[in-house]
Swiss-Prot record:
NDH shuttles electrons from NAD(P)H:plastoquinone, via FMN and iron-sulfur (Fe-S) centers, to quinones in the photosynthetic chain and possibly in a chloroplast respiratory chain. The immediate electron acceptor for the enzyme in this species is believed to be plastoquinone. Couples the redox reaction to proton translocation, and thus conserves the redox energy in a proton gradient. It catalyses: a plastoquinone + NADH + (n+1) H(+)(in) = a plastoquinol + NAD(+) + n H(+)(out); a plastoquinone + NADPH + (n+1) H(+)(in) = a plastoquinol + NADP(+) + n H(+)(out). Keywords: Chloroplast, Membrane, NAD, NADP, Plastid, Plastoquinone, Quinone, Thylakoid, Translocase, Transmembrane, Transmembrane helix, Transport. This is NAD(P)H-quinone oxidoreductase subunit 3, chloroplastic. The chain crosses the membrane at residues 9-29, 64-84, 88-108. It holds the Pfam family Oxidored_q4. Its EC number is 7.1.1.-. It comes from the Eukaryota. Belongs to the complex I subunit 3 family. PANTHER family: NADH-UBIQUINONE OXIDOREDUCTASE CHAIN 3.
Amino acid sequence: MFLLHEYDIFWAFLIISSVIPILAFLISGVLAPISEGPEKLSSYESGIEPMGDAWLQFRIRYYMFALVFVVFDVETVFLYPWAMSFDVLGVSVFIEALIFVLILIVGLVYAWRKGALEWS
């Protein structure tokens, strides 16, 4: 027999956790004072008037470093749960994780040889 009442706590939590943010936005929209003026329309930079043009171009080097960082950050996110349950999972999962790390190392070596990590 299918017992759906076992999921009542889950559905109650889901509904309550969805209703609370919606209510917070609605209440803040109703209670917040509406004031428009030149101060509200101006940009704000650490308490001072902004100087210069806001559109700055970053060098492509920053993007390459950021991309390599994101790749290895995601690797850490994937490998941490695996490391925490290593003794339960067995050798086959170890081999899969090893292949995953080797693919990322090959990608790092490729980026290194192509000069993506060179600053000059």
